[in-house]
Design a protein with these regions (language model features):
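Cytochrome P450 heme-binding "Cys pocket" and the immediately downstream C-terminal segment
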Residues: 341, 462, 468-505
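Charged/polar low-complexity intrinsically disordered regions
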Residues: 93-98, 104-107, 112-205
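Classical protein tyrosine phosphatase
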Residues: 322-347
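Conserved cytochrome P450 K-helix/beta-meander segment immediately N-terminal to the heme-binding cysteine loop
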Residues: 411-445
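Cytochrome P450 heme-thiolate monooxygenase catalytic core
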Residues: 162-326
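N-terminal membrane-proximal hinge/A-helix region immediately C-terminal to the signal-anchor transmembrane segment
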Residues: 2-145, 454
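Conserved cytochrome P450 K-helix E-x-x-R motif and the immediately C-terminal K′/meander segment
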Residues: 71-79, 355-401, 413-414, 420
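Cytochrome P450 heme-thiolate "Cys pocket" and heme-binding signature region
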Residues: 435-476, 501
Length: 528
């Protein structure tokens, strides 16, 4: 029997008569009842935390309403919960069931807790078992292959990638922004996405593939569609997702993207294998290409881990491109609304690049630019709750709360906008962290790549984002080109507010800016 072309959403009226097999009615009814109960019944929560308030309660057959409330109004739900319950944990129904939300004050207590699992938290969401999300399994795998590659290989390689990043950044910025000295309107997010995709691909796959238009399109499409497909799928209860994913439009797109990625990466791997065989046969040194393809292969062999190279490249591209694109766009939006800071930033960029050229130390010394990036991330992080973890063994917190094995927790990110921590927290203060560097004991904490209990845009503790050091350099290189070569201002009437979807808080995807190439640039940074 042919598969149906589309699956009705759970909000539609189904034509059950057309779906019920006449000879299998008892089995269909049983299956239907299981599906309904699975959809309606809340995820189980141990009685030890039943005393915690549930901030978006759902009764029998009303789970859908609670999840829709979370998807539309997570920010206001969190705000009301803080107001009502103060610094106490509470429960919340999300797309992935019920979770315990811990206030930010608990972040130092749990940051390195071995009974809380990062990979387990991802595995519980059960998407990595589906073919279109196979790349996600690389991130959630307990072997930590991807994280190891970033920590051991990419971070070690940072001093060697600054010049390639600068070269690719110059090309990508010119390609997207043009050379016109007349003001023109620009859709911000697509341009920033392309710039970051090109720069990241230069480091991950080398100069040849980073110019491959099909690969660039794949990485950009995957970055955009992966999160949207997850959001689309999360509207359905977990037990149904293994069935409905076959019918969802964005899931179909992802499966096609995965196939295209394999078609591009497989010949590259085969070609490299042949080069190595030829070198070995000739008694020559076997080449190591020193990019993410070789890093992954090296670490996987050392760990004895099987993996799909194309899936690993997609996930590596996703984690690098998704967050960096978002923050780069947010920084430009913030600067466009505060042009008074631009001359001082340009002065810093020119001073450091003129003195030392495109070096890792030059980027490190751009402390005002560093402060701006950290402030934009503080004011608009990529989410409202962070540090998703699953409890692997019963754990009692300092307040006496017993977290039982199998439960899930998130940490509220409100502390990054708390007036008790930051003065005027709702304002964008570009020198906030630059000034903080002068305070005793806070010079290190004020750096963009440093995580703390007061600023955890990259997470905190053992599982803090290992790629933040690369992201810092990549963003600074991109901003050097964008700010030194171009003038910026908001397009009239453009939207600037973040897009809220559940706990996600994305830089405005429809924002538009006006941009023009500067005529008299203080330093030719393309020839240093």
């Amino acid at each position: 029997m042919a598969s149906p072309s589309a699956l009705p959403s759970l909000g539609q009226d189904w034509n059950y008569q057309s779906l019920i097999p006449t000879k299998s009615t008892p089995y269909f009814i049983l299956t239907l009842m299981v599906m309904i109960v699975a959809y309606a019944w809340p995820s189980s929560t141990d009685s030890s935390v039943k005393k915690l308030p549930l901030v978006n309660p759902a009764g029998f057959f009303s789970m859908k309403q609670a999840k829709q409330q979370y998807r539309r109004s997570a920010k206001s739900i969190l705000k009301n919960a803080r107001k009502q319950y103060g610094n106490q944990p509470f429960r919340m129904i999300t797309d992935f069931g019920e979770v315990v939300i811990l206030p930010s004050e608990f972040i130092d207590e749990i940051r390195n807790e071995p009974k809380l699992s990062f990979s387990g938290g991802l595995e519980q969401e059960r998407t990595s078992q589906l073919p279109e999300f196979e790349a996600f399994a690389i991130l959630s795998n307990r072997s930590q292959l991807l994280q190891t590659v970033v920590k051991k290989q990419l971070t070690k390689f940072l001093s060697k990638v600054t010049e390639p990043l600068a070269q690719e950044g110059a090309h990508a910025v010119s390609l997207n922004l043009g050379e016109s000295q007349e003001w023109r309107e620009l859709a911000l997010r697509p341009a920033m996405l392309d710039i970051i995709a090109r720069m990241s691909s230069r480091v991950f796959l080398g100069e040849e593939i980073c110019k491959n238009k099909e690969w660039l399109d794949i990485t950009k499409e995957f970055t955009v569609n992966f999160t949207s497909a997850m959001f689309e799928l999360s509207a359905y209860p977990v037990p149904l997702r293994r069935f409905v994913h076959w019918f969802l439009p964005l899931c179909k797109v992802l499966r096609a993207t995965n196939s295209r990625a394999k078609e591009i990466i497989a010949p590259v791997i085969a070609k490299r294998a042949e080069i190595r065989r030829a070198a070995q046969a000739a008694g020559q040194e076997v080449p190591f290409f020193n990019d993410a393809l070789d890093w992954l292969d090296q670490e996987a062999k050392a760990m004895g881990v099987d993996y799909r190279p194309d899936a690993a490249q997609l996930m590596l591209s996703f984690v690098a491109i998704h967050t960096s694109t978002d923050l780069l766009g947010q920084v430009i939006l913030d600067i466009a609304q505060h042009p008074e800071i631009v001359p001082e930033v340009r002065e810093e960029i020119v001073r450091e690049l003129r003195a030392n050229g495109w070096k890792k130390t030059s980027l490190y010394n751009m402390k005002l630019l560093d402060s701006i990036m950290k402030e934009s991330q503080r004011r608009k992080p990529i989410g409202m709750a962070i540090m998703r973890r699953s409890v692997t063994e019963d754990l009692r917190l300092s307040n006496g709360l017993l977290l039982k094995k199998g439960m899930r927790i998130h940490v509220d990110m409100h502390r990054m906008q708390d007036e008790e921590v930051y003065e005027n927290p709702d304002e964008w203060v570009p020198k906030r962290f630059l000034d903080m560097r002068t305070q005793a004991g806070k010079e290190h904490l004020s750096q963009f790549v440093t995580t703390s209990g007061d600023h955890f845009g990259f997470g905190h503790g053992e599982h803090a984002c290992p790629g933040r050091f690369f992201a810092s350099n990549e963003l600074k290189v991109a901003l050097c080109h964008l700010l030194l070569k171009y003038d910026w201002k908001l397009a009239p009437g453009t939207a600037v507010n973040p897009l809220m979807r559940g706990f996600s808080m994305l830089s405005c995807p429809t924002a538009k800016v006006l941009v023009q190439r500067r005529e008299n640039i203080e330093l030719d940074i393309d020839s240093i």
